[in-house]
Amino acid sequence: MLLLDGQLKPALPQKVFCRLWAVMGKLQSKLRHSTYLYSRPDGIIEERVQTKAPQEYIPVHVDTVSVIATLNSDLCISGGKDKTAVAYNWKTGRMVKRFTGHEREITKIACIPKANQFFSASRDKTVLMWDLQGSSHPRQQLSGHAMVVTGLAVSPDSSQLCTGSRDNSLLLWDVGTGQCVERASVSRNLVTHLCWVPSEPYIVQTSEDKTIRLWDSRGLQMAHMFPTKQHIQTHCEVSVDGHTCISCSSGFGGEGCEATLWDLRQTRDRMCEYKGHFQTVASCVFLPKSTALMPMIATSAHDSKVKIWNQDTGACLSTLSLDGSGPLTSLAVGDISSLLCASFYRGVHLLRVDHSQGLELQEVAAF
């Protein structure tokens, strides 16, 4: 029941409420500017309002964008609730190709950049392989999970694919033949994300059971389990050198809602935590080395904020509030100064990281 004008009224049906919420979010995005925290050269952090409106391109998805990944220096691949994957040139604002084949929402994307190919996972329990230069129909279908597929990771040599699901299992596939070659299952291990360690046979995996696991792809055996966290681990990312990984946590009201840096070498200890979001942190990435003197990471969360952190100290260097976008679902690195951020209500945001005077994070386009 709802209290309106001092009287109890019947609550809105769920579908109507969801549509109303989406409309309110989109309206809010047109009425409010994005705000961000600017880190000045003298170390002072101040809040600013972005006065220059971002370029608004025609949205490539008609519903929530669940995942974004970069295929090469110009193209990104996005997937969402509209069941399609889209190849998009984020530098020119032009859609390159739409891929249709899944029966339900796309949950994950994993790219093979050198081959211009990618995999998509879905709530329809399948994984499809696509070729940018080929047909708009899938090149290959991998079926083996009993529930929604929630993890995808391609091996460094692109010969193997690891998939994970809410069915508690991980499957290892031969990309060339499309055959499942290994299977592993752990009770209550509801997979949320997978990431292959560069130049290594290891796979990092996050789970709803609040743990981060390290798997050896040689036989698909669990090699290590990091200390259990207090909240669901939603995502993970491995550094380019393979020495560290980040995981991020669910939460609400600032409880949980953090990202954590882990050592993947001998000690495998927790190295740093990044706290400042107020809702579930859905994605985390290492930023490429830049003119900045410090290594940095970025996070996006359901509180509509993207944050940049000093990787070594845990200090928040910049915060961008994407008002009206709703929960932010996925982050991807475009290039040394660009981030791509997927959202519930406003598609994909192109963000610019500017180091010319201090540190600024601003939205420059949406599609």
From Swiss-Prot:
Gene3D superfamilies: YVTN repeat-like/Quinoprotein amine dehydrogenase
SUPFAM superfamilies, per the entry: WD40 repeat-like
Superkingdom per UniProt: Eukaryota
UniProt WD repeat ranges: 60-100, 101-140, 144-183, 186-225, 276-319
The keyword Repeat is assigned to this record: yes
InterPro entries: G-protein_beta_WD-40_rep, WD40/YVTN_repeat-like_dom_sf, WD40_repeat_CS, WD40_repeat_dom_sf, WD40_rpt, WDR31
Pfam family, one: WD40
Keywords: Repeat, WD repeat
Protein name as it appears in the record: WD repeat-containing protein 31
